[in-house]
């Protein structure tokens, strides 16, 4: 057993002295255990004089100089496999849901290399989500990374839960949710809502919330990722990985960097910002065995998209889903902005000509409606040309048809949720663009699944 001695404690940073020939490797887990204390730390720097600087992953209250610290000889390992589904973990992979120990012998280290060039599968397959606005206008690629933007109360959590539900029930896939530095109350709400809506048993949850020391918030993303990698590599699954919030990962890195005495770079962020982000993001990919598709909520500090944290994240994204308060105010949910959301695979070579043309057609009509709104506000609808009146009518139908009832919101809306297959989505919008449903009232298109439901609802209304 390789034992050292604590020589200095400054907040979450602890210096430990070892024998000269037995220095622990970087990233090794180092534990300090007494009757009252049980702390795991990670070796971060070799300082010289046989001293290792460590970052603690839990509170360092009660630590004293001279205490014994033990090098475990390996990085932090976390439980993986099906036993993790339906459970709630902390950064060390310890269950925190009072449901007893996890029934698994499989454990993996949280620091692992990204899949090599040969193992990667550059697939440009669409991941069908069953959510019309996403599948049509900003489709997700299997193994892609999606940024989810939205302020408070526009429906990020509900959208995340619906995605988890659809992947679980329609594709039989699993999800991993990593709560990084967000509010504990929100994590608790999510856990209880998932329990109620029945998606919990298909999901592993890992939390390192705002009250945790920066070391825990920096590593909790890797803990969730390691669990997701096991489902991809050992079980050949298409896994969904949610990270909420990727900005807090950067923020924790910046705190740790300052504590370790590194010179800050732009806007006070860590000099290793791009490296840390890359080490996490490069492990999220498609391999020949399976894929990890990741949806990352992105907080934009002071709405400044040029801030180094969001700017570094953008370099890794394949698609963005932007939730808009204006759309939520119209009562259209999911409140995805059809003109602001983007996708790298919105390309006829990937999606096929029909899907691409319909998507672009929908965007053109909505864009024209946006331009005409000022004229309508000042002069009224009557001043528009016949052609523009038709565009406005179709745009309003499209806008309403982009809404749909969610399974996970059934308890609140009283409406059964719908999963809309991609072909049905394309057919529906194509028919609206062609003017086949110009005679139906726009209310018929609100909160329905397929176009057939809209027609039926329209006939009942007329």
UniProtKB/Swiss-Prot annotation:
Membrane topology type: Peripheral membrane protein
Pfam families cross-referenced by the UniProt entry: ATP-synt_ab, ATP-synt_ab_N, ATP-synt_VA_C
GO molecular function list: ATP binding; ATP hydrolysis activity; proton-transporting ATP synthase activity, rotational mechanism
Catalytic reactions on record: ATP + H2O + 4 H(+)(in) = ADP + phosphate + 5 H(+)(out)
Broad enzyme group: translocase
Family listed: Belongs to the ATPase alpha/beta chains family.
Endpoints of the signal sequence: none
Protein name: ATP synthase subunit beta
Entry binding sites for ATP: 150-157
Cellular location(s): Cell membrane
Matches recorded under InterPro entries: AAA+_ATPase (IPR003593), ATP-synt_VA_C (IPR055190), ATP_synth_F1_bsu (IPR005722), ATPase_a/bsu_AS (IPR020003), ATPase_alpha/beta_chains (IPR050053), ATPase_F1/V1/A1_a/bsu_N (IPR004100), ATPase_F1/V1/A1_a/bsu_N_sf (IPR036121), ATPase_F1/V1/A1_a/bsu_nucl-bd (IPR000194)
Chief location of this protein within or outside the cell: membrane
Species of origin: Moorella thermoacetica (strain ATCC 39073 / JCM 9320)
Any single GO CC term annotated in Swiss-Prot or TrEMBL for this entry: plasma membrane
Keywords: ATP synthesis, ATP-binding, Cell membrane, CF(1), Hydrogen ion transport, Ion transport, Membrane, Nucleotide-binding, Translocase, Transport
Subunit structure: F-type ATPases have 2 components, CF(1) - the catalytic core - and CF(0) - the membrane proton channel. CF(1) has five subunits: alpha(3), beta(3), gamma(1), delta(1), epsilon(1). CF(0) has three main subunits: a(1), b(2) and c(9-12). The alpha and beta chains form an alternating ring which encloses part of the gamma chain. CF(1) is attached to CF(0) by a central stalk formed by the gamma and epsilon chains, while a peripheral stalk is formed by the delta and b chains.
Annotated function: Produces ATP from ADP in the presence of a proton gradient across the membrane. The catalytic sites are hosted primarily by the beta subunits.
Lineage: superkingdom: Bacteria
EC number(s) on file: 7.1.2.2
């Amino acid at each position: 057993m390789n034992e050292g001695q604590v020589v200095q404690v400054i907040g979450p940073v602890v210096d430990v002295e070892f024998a000269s020939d037995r220095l622990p490797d970087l990233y090794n887990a180092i534990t300090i255990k007494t009757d009252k204390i049980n702390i795991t730390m990670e070796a971060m720097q070799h300082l010289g004089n046989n001293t290792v600087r460590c970052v603690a992953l839990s509170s360092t209250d009660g630590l004293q100089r001279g205490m014994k610290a033990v090098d475990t000889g390996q990085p932090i390992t976390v439980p993986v496999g099906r036993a993790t589904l339906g459970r709630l973990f902390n950064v060390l992979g310890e269950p925190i849901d009072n449901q007893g120990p996890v029934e698994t012998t499989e454990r993996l280290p949280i620091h692992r290399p990204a899949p090599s060039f040969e193992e990667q599968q550059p697939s440009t397959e669409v991941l069908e989500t069953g959510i019309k606005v996403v599948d049509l206008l900003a489709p997700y690629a299997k193994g892609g990374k999606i940024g989810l933007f939205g302020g408070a109360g526009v429906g990020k959590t509900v959208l995340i839960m619906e995605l988890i539900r659809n992947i679980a029930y329609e594709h039989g896939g699993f999800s991993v949710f990593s709560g990084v530095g967000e509010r504990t109350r929100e994590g608790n709400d999510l856990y209880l809502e998932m329990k109620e809506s029945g998606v919990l048993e298909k999901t592993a949850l890992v939390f390192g919330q705002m009250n945790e020391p920066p070391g825990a918030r920096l590593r909790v993303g890797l803990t969730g990722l390691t669990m997701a990698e096991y489902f991809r590599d050992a079980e050949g699954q298409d896994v969904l990985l949610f990270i909420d919030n990727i900005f807090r990962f950067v923020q924790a890195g910046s705190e740790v960097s300052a504590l370790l005495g590194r010179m800050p770079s732009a806007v006070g962020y860590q000099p290793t910002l791009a490296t840390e982000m890359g080490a996490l993001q490069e492990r999220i990919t498609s391999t020949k065995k399976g894929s990890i598709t990741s949806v990352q909520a992105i907080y934009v500090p002071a709405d400044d998209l040029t801030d180094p944290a969001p700017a570094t994240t953008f370099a890794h994204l394949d698609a963005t889903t932007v939730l808009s308060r204006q759309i939520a105010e119209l009562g259209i949910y999911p409140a995805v902005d059809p003109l602001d959301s983007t996708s790298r695979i919105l390309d006829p070579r990937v999606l096929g000509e029909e899907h691409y043309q319909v998507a672009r057609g929908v965007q053109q009509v909505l864009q024209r409606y946006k331009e005409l709104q000022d004229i309508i506000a000042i002069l009224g609808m009557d001043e528009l040309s016949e052609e523009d009146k038709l565009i406005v009518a179709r745009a309003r139908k499209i806008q309403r048809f982009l809404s749909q009832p969610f399974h996970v919101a059934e308890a609140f809306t009283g409406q059964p949720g719908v999963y809309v297959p991609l072909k049905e989505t394309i057919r529906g919008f194509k028919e609206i663009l062609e003017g086949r449903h110009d005679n139906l009232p726009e209310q018929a298109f609100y909160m329905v699944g397929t176009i057939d439901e809209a027609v039926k609802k329209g006939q009942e209304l007329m």
